[in-house]
């Protein structure tokens, strides 16, 4: 199972998450109590295991800003929130594929869940599966407070059938209000490809609680292992198997 610890702001927190078995570390490069700079991420990146992915989280960021941040912060993935350019993922994919010196960059798109959003989410999933513009779709909570990191959750039972319909076409990541105590329920209900957490493992905004980080990762992996079956689709790379 793929697990991202997001909203990380320090080397100590990033290393602890990696050593606890996280698949990816998320760095918020947008207005947020967890915001970090490209320089901060660049200082952290060399000290993480190379098989742990490093995601930059962007809100309404343009093409040039994202490309520069990926290069300067040594990111391996981008998470895109609310950009008005529907072609941005495809343009980013083409750009990084054309750079011979660039390693493959993973692209996550984010949508906030609500009942009336289901047709749009399914359309995006079909388009993504056909054109390969994104690697996964992160389904977060809808909140007036901000984009991600709000600690609120959506109705997993209501979203269950959406996850089941879309999963054969596209990897889905569950996010929004997850914590060590409920991540097992989320995995059992939604059967996501991955999970993403920020506030649910914090001691304070931007500062992780080591025990909660370790418990979240342990509970997620144990639950996934219990549900795993030979028919589950294989992931495309070894990083997701961590």
Identify the role of each PLM range.
Residues 17, 78, 137, 155, ...:
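Conserved, mostly hydrophobic/aromatic
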Residues 40-48, 91-92, 99, 198-242:
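C-terminal helical cap(s) of enzyme catalytic domains, especially alpha/beta-barrels
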Residues 16-22:
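A short, Lys/Arg-enriched amphipathic alpha-helix followed by its capping loop at the start of a domain
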Residues 11, 179-183:
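Acidic, divalent-metal-coordinating active-site segment for phosphoryl/phosphodiester hydrolysis
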Residues 3-13:
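N-terminal basic/disordered segments at the start of proteins
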Residues 24, 29-33, 40, 47-173, ...:
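Conserved anion-binding
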Residues 74-75, 192-195:
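Proline-aspartate-enriched helix->loop->beta-strand connector
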């Amino acid at each position: 199972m793929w697990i991202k610890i997001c909203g990380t702001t320090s080397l100590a927190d990033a290393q602890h998450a990696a050593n606890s078995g996280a698949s990816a570390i998320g760095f918020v490069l947008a207005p947020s109590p967890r915001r970090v700079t490209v320089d901060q991420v660049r200082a952290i990146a060399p000290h993480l295991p190379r098989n742990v992915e490093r995601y930059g989280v962007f809100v309404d960021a343009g093409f040039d800003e994202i490309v520069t941040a990926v290069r300067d912060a040594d990111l391996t993935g981008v998470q895109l929130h609310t950009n008005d350019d529907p072609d941005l993922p495809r343009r980013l994919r083409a750009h990084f594929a054309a750079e011979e010196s660039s390693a493959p960059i993973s692209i996550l798109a984010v949508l906030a869940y609500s009942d009336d959003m289901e047709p749009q989410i399914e359309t995006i999933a079909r388009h993504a599966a056909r054109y390969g513009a994104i690697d996964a779709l992160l389904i977060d909570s809808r909140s007036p407070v901000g984009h991600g990191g709000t600690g609120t959750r959506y109705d997993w039972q209501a979203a269950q059938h959406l996850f089941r319909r879309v999963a054969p076409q596209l990897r889905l990541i569950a996010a929004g209000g997850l914590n060590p105590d409920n991540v097992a329920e989320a995995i059992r209900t939604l059967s996501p490809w991955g999970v993403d957490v920020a506030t649910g493992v914090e001691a304070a905004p931007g500062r992780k609680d080591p025990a909660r980080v370790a418990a979240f990762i342990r509970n997620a992996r144990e639950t996934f292992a219990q549900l795993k079956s030979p028919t589950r689709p294989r992931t495309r790379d070894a990083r997701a198997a961590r």
